[in-house]
């Protein structure tokens, strides 16, 4: 099938090549033989009058023309997928769709696990794939390779829509056995204590609390750096170290280990956990259902938490 001289099947081949960065892998991803894929690449080069890529050692380097085509091709194919192939109906109780969600250890522990538990009872055919956020999570969003991303608002991409799910506060926590009778009475005392901090991804991105400390000129003695908030409670057990982490996650871990929340002589920041999705998935009925389902569960969680959320003792 041709449209103004372009064989539309070649768009599928081009998208696979741009996604896989390998002729062999691209061929496998769309069930073509390697000779057929190589022939498609040659036809694409002729149509666009461009090499599309060159080989530099073992690395495949795309041309500027190929790079410029990538988002448009992804957008076209994703729109076909969401508006034509999937049809006009989405029945959650009958669907076997797999929803791919980027979710941190924090959001999985205090929010997504409840969502999945509820779905497993009433919507047993639905499946979920949870992906840990890393430095390329926005690339997955740009390529529409995930259905949703759940992270704090400060990490939201400006290229896609998002909505707030719930608000969270940060608290200072330590081992209850080692800090049974201790309070923190001054900023100087807090800064002089030994700290554990969380940084994220290969780039070791600082957490919200680190930005807060830097903006307020607070320099702490950092003994240990971990890559998730969930690593903090085990690390501080049996020590005098303290850390700052989300309150709901402290509540979660306090069921398994002794934790103490300290009142600090200065306010800690709050953050808003948000839901983001690929912009081209906005009209997709399945994605619309997922967004509503997540928002409804977030609302229910806030209602259940409201009575005890204002306190900071565990």
UniProtKB/Swiss-Prot annotation:
Domain HTH lysR-type intervals: 6-63
PANTHER family: HTH-TYPE TRANSCRIPTIONAL REGULATOR LEUO, HTH-TYPE TRANSCRIPTIONAL REGULATOR LEUO-RELATED
Gene: nodD
Pfam families cross-referenced by the UniProt entry: HTH_1, LysR_substrate
Classification via InterPro entries: LysR-type_TF, LysR_subst-bd, NodD_PBP2, Tscrpt_reg_HTH_LysR, WH-like_DNA-bd_sf, WH_DNA-bd_sf
A single MF term (Gene Ontology): DNA binding
DNA-binding span(s): 23-42
Protein name: Nodulation protein D
Family statement: Belongs to the LysR transcriptional regulatory family.
Function: NodD regulates the expression of the nodABCFE genes which encode other nodulation proteins. NodD is also a negative regulator of its own expression. Binds flavonoids as inducers.
Record keywords: Activator, DNA-binding, Nodulation, Repressor, Transcription, Transcription regulation
């Amino acid at each position: 099938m041709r449209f103004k001289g372009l064989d539309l099947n070649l768009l599928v081949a081009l998208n696979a090549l741009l996604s896989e960065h390998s002729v062999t892998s691209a061929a496998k991803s769309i069930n073509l033989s390697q000779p057929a894929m190589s022939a498609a690449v040659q036809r694409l080069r002729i149509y666009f009058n461009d090499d599309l890529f060159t080989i530099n050692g073992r690395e495949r380097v795309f041309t500027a023309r190929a790079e410029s085509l990538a988002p448009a091709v992804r957008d076209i194919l994703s729109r076909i997928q969401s508006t034509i192939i999937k049809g006009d109906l989405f029945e959650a109780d009958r669907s076997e769709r797999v929803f791919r969600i980027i979710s941190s250890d924090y959001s999985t522990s205090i929010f997504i696990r409840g969502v999945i538990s509820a779905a497993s009872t009433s919507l047993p055919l639905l499946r979920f794939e949870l992906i840990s956020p890393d430095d390329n999570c926005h690339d997955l969003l740009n390529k529409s390779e995930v259905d949703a991303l759940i992270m704090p608002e400060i990490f939201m991409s400006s290229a896609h829509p998002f909505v707030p799910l719930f608000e969270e506060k940060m608290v200072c926590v330590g081992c209850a056995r080692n800090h049974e009778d201790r309070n923190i009475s001054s900023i100087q005392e807090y800064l002089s204590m030994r700290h554990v901090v969380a940084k994220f991804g290969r780039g070791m991105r600082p957490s919200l609390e680190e930005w807060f400390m830097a903006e307020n000129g607070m320099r702490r003695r950092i003994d240990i750096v971990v890559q998730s908030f969930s690593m903090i409670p085990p690390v501080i057990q049996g020590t005098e170290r303290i850390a700052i982490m989300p309150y709901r996650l402290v509540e979660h871990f306090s069921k398994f280990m002794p934790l103490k929340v300290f009142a600090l002589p200065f306010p800690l920041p709050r953050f808003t956990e948000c839901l983001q999705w690929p912009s081209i998935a906005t009209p997709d009925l399945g994605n619309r259902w997922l967004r509503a389902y997540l928002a409804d569960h977030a609302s229910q969680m806030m209602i259940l938490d409201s009575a005890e959320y204002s306190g900071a003792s565990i």
